[in-house]
A protein has these predicted regions:
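Hydrophobic cores of alpha-helical transmembrane segments in multi-pass inner/ER membrane proteins
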Residues: 12-24, 71-84, 98, 121-134, ...
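Cytoplasm-facing juxtamembrane segments at the starts of transmembrane helices
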Residues: 33-46, 86-102, 115-123, 132-207, ...
Length: 281
């Protein structure tokens, strides 16, 4: 048991160090090439998260045997699409990546009892939910502020607790790894280079973790959906404050951070009372 815990802690430390050191090295390598730095950083995150999936899954099976084995492949596919410098590809990259991730997640259960209507309903609702959050957060990540990093990392850490008590310790470990990777990257690279490609990889990763736990473990769909929309909801609720003349930039920043904390506490309490969590066996 002690060796198991040590190996897991070592894995999480390695993720943080790789993300931090990799971001520092890439920042110095492409200091005068911001566009190349953007591409390099989202590839770094995609590779780190894909390797994390392989570690947690005990290998990199091909073809994947379970839905969660697909997560790493989907992230690399998303990074590849974002790297293609064509306007059309850039426009559809989020749609194509999310659609692929949803299909490979739903396909195993669809082959074992779901009808076309059920499959289509889940696909449509999942895709719309992903795109809504993606669109709402689009402008938030033009610069790499502490606020932006909190909107990405904090929900991942909260989701890790929910995933664990919903019956999936493996997905919970991946969520923690994702939160650490994102936080480390923002600590080492405070520039606009951590833009939309980086955000897209992070959001897609978080979304697929929640979807997998909803379908194949015991995370209630409504709670998963609420947890998913928390960052977008916080931004939308804070927008009217930004328009007030008396609201300073710092005040708006504090309002978003406080709103994020309150929203996550509410979701956590709902999860506690609905699921009545116990440690998975």
């Amino acid at each position: 048991m002690e060796a198991f815990v040590i190996s897991r802690l070592a894995f999480l430390v390695a993720v943080g160090l790789a993300s931090f050191a990799g971001s520092v090295v890439l920042g110095r390598r492409f200091v005068k090439q911001p566009e190349r730095l953007r591409v390099a950083l989202w590839w770094l995150l995609a590779v780190i998260l894909a390797l994390s999936c392989a570690w947690v899954n005990g290998g990199w099976p091909f073809p994947p045997r379970e839905s969660q084995h697909w997560i790493g492949y989907v992230l690399l596919f998303a990074a590849l699409l974002r790297s293609i410098d064509l306007p059309t590809v850039q426009l559809i990259s989020a749609l194509a990546s999310a659609a692929l991730g949803i299909v490979v997640t739903l396909l195993p259960i669809a082959q074992n009892g779901w009808g076309p209507v059920m499959l289509g309903s889940w696909f449509f609702v999942s895709l719309v939910s992903y795109l809504i959050v993606r669109v709402v957060l689009h402008k938030e990540f033009e610069i790499a502020s502490l606020r932006a990093s909190l909107l990405l990392a904090v929900p991942l850490f909260v989701s890790a607790v929910m995933l664990f008590f919903a019956g999936s310790a493996m997905l919970a470990e991946l969520a923690v790894a994702g939160g650490i990777a994102v936080a480390a990257a923002y600590l080492s690279q405070r520039s606009s280079a951590l833009g939309h490609g980086f955000v897209e990889i992070t959001l897609l990763f978080h979304f697929l973790l929640l979807l997998n736990c909803t379908i194949y473990a015991d995370l209630p769909p409504v709670l998963a959906w609420l947890q998913w929309i928390v960052p977008a909801l916080v931004i939308l609720l804070a927008q009217p404050l930004h328009l007030q003349k008396w609201m300073t930039r710092r005040g708006h920043y504090i309002a978003i951070v406080v709103g994020l904390g309150v929203a996550e506490c509410v979701v956590g309490l709902l999860f506690y009372f609905v699921v009545k969590p116990t440690a998975p066996s």
